[in-house]
């Protein structure tokens, strides 16, 4: 791994800043689709993009599961001086992701309508959701490989290069979205196609790095290593769940909103889900930017350094969470108006109100995500998975069921804050137990 060696803090910043930017860019892919679809098609089409988000976040979560698990092992091998083993694990990861991507594409295309219905598409929304998902599915392989390559380039010691590549893809996506949706009027198909083509273009840049003379990590002859696959999945499970949590949250919220409030509130939640994704992915950027460094020093058996990196990560998450809440609270009206026209005055007022409730959960989310990432980095996969499952599934579902049963549908918007609070108690307890051991 290429480190500058000036100080631990400088290396920390050098890794997390590009990682956070990369997470923003990945989040903006779908958000940009939503903005152009809302402006160029309709609010119903925007809701269809939101309905489809669990699928796209599912693709990214698979990518992150394997990418983080793979980069953890690669970083440990590099720290131990085992470059050949690092290359073999990297190569195996790419082959497995290609096979998995093809299977996902085939299954989604065969069961396209039932899948869209399962995600929550009503008769009104189904045509748009079917088009969006059906266009994204053939690009599954580039979606999944894109983030995996981005993570491995950072592990290779080139975080700035990874940021340049992923930002180039985002710029291309914006340009293609504008041309296909606003100029050529290709609707949700145009938005989905623009995203897929942009991801494919970035893959070519990543391959140029791994096949070129710069990198330490290279393709090698494929060897099937089942034990390393299991180790990789265990290490990456927490990060994969963290990424998929935004999709899980969207799915459960969509179902609850349709049941307790009404279809109109789906538009409000679509806007909230974009904001939530950006903030949670920012926290994941801190965790994943720190991860290669923690794993590297863990492999070198230098606990004082990787414990200090955890402190840096927690401080960054706390500061980022407070900043996110302040920005979103003050700028709630401007955020909502990115998606809604002034003629939708009552919907704008409602969306601003519920957004300001939802964002309170950000104050705790970052701490949970960073602690989960730390446990992944030191190969305590069970702890990391417990944290991710609690915040994204167990505590959230219990909160949704309890709040709606006792206080009614509008209490839905408080569920994330309750879930994050419960999870933080668990996270702190696990860390205290691990530290004493």
Residue ranges and their predicted role:
Residues 67, 135-154, 162-173, 191-204, ...:
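Short runs within selected transmembrane alpha-helices of multi-pass transporters and secretion channels
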Residues 58-61, 105, 173-178, 203-207, ...:
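Hydrophobic transmembrane alpha-helices of multi-pass small-molecule transporters
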Residues 46-106, 143-162, 268-332, 365-387:
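Small-residue-rich hydrophobic transmembrane alpha-helices
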Residues 17, 33, 70, 111-112, ...:
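Hydrophobic/aromatic residues in alpha-helical transmembrane segments
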